[in-house]
């Protein structure tokens, strides 16, 4: 098969299975780098590839999954040498069978900012180095797999597109709840990866065929029918005794049969699968034609955790905009991100579904500030952002660091503007707002604005931007100055909707500028526009009149089925007059955004700041409280309860890892203020308990352990972090010498479960007075009990609960 024929096959292509599984069976030593075998034992690697090719695999992944600078640190061979050898081995095995050799690329092994310390552009450059090495070695395509962070996958996709012309298969790993480790949804992955230039998208690892199937079905619905989708499930789930996976090749083939109805581009296996698994897939997918019937693609905007389908009236919060706001302009000039974040959080709480982001102000370096604001916002709120600027460089800088499918506001009918903006939108997979204005200015007649909108639409389509990603703004003029042109906007909007088949958007509040009682005019104009076909309303979500109009309109037009959203928002509302009386008498409160009980009293503001991840607010509120309260009182009455609230939401699945880490970061900023106050009083800061953490011998994965460390430290525990690939004797010696009574051990690979068992046995044999909690992707509660652990910690929150229980705090 030639690369040019890759996506023209008349039958579902078979991928390969687990390389690690085969290497373990061949006696891979604990702690050895599998990728070094490309050079030290090429016959072994080539032989495994050949077995998969003989079984029917037509895309074979080279043994390069962990070939990154971070994971190869300390190796005797360079990244380029290992990749070149890996591709050469793979191509030799592929040649007799006409199979293609893929550069296999996995995660770097480090968390990206803001969840970790790896800068986005550093990640792009590291992936670029990998891609360049693979392309130079003659790889036929690139296979990104087992990603759990959409931001890291974006870095990888940009690196691939900017440094090669090879086809790209992109895959993420999802947990049983349908989200990745970092909270990314299946739909957000599919939409974002497709927009960034992936040639095909898929799901691999983590789960077996039965568990992955509903997610794979969702993925096929998130992309066009002719867009390639693939799967590589595990051989079921790990056995409780750590001896492998629980599905036989025959059962795997049986559980893969339902995938025929998805008309996949390709299918294979991941952990636990062997050439026999792949051989049996030949019969499963015989005669299965890739591609699904065409279906209408929704207009969507997304972040990893928040997927907004623009169906019904969607509210775009307008408050992150310095126009006419002196305090906002000052905040931008002073780089006061805390003020910007406060504006964002308040709009989220008011019900905005998208946030407009404009940082253009006098005295501001907009190209430098836009990416800073985008990153700051995305560290705290999960709503999609609309990047609002007339500065092309500012837009590109913001688009590059945006995590998800972005939204650009805007281009217009001027040829030079279209030429500058549309390629950016195409490169970064962004939706685009087209203003119905050109070099002649805003034309009063509706038909003239429609003509401009048509030119914009045609240009966008020609640039490769799909129709569902085109939004036309027919421009709201002020009724005070251009009253006779108000209806022209509504008429043009209606015509664009009907004639061009695009989405529509308006900055609603402009209508009332310069007139009294603005909410009356805004709400009435909004209602007129909605009836004419408005899709997105840029407005102030804190305007109760306007929000009520939106929710009511969605009910009356049957967009809000069974009035569920309306009921959720208004069922417990009280009349305005009563609400005012209650507000006047009420103490400060912190309301949880998920509808949980309000927290009142002097600590409410600090609790809210931690919950929302507002580091600046958390520090300021802590300083204010310390003027009246004792430091430990602030910890016990505010910080620990705040972390408990966040942890409870994390367990319920209403909040995800990035928010958990940002809340921990906000709590840390508060703790720093408390430490300073204690030091000024000449007192010591008492630890709530000392804990040793370690990733066991032979395992180089430490992301999970590092997250546990952050959470434990924010609960006031002292953590002795021994790092990764930690020898058994190091753990035992540290526990003895430091007099530690609680140990946390982590393992991510089935091959290192034996190391965990040996470490626990050594701790017991040394008769040390300590308890042990264990965690990691391959562990189960049953296996944890079997190897002598005292607790199984499924995540960081559970680790904190165990520590609190053990130390009695």
Residue spans for each PLM region:
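Domain-level signal for soluble alpha/beta catalytic cores
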Residues: 1-473, 477-809
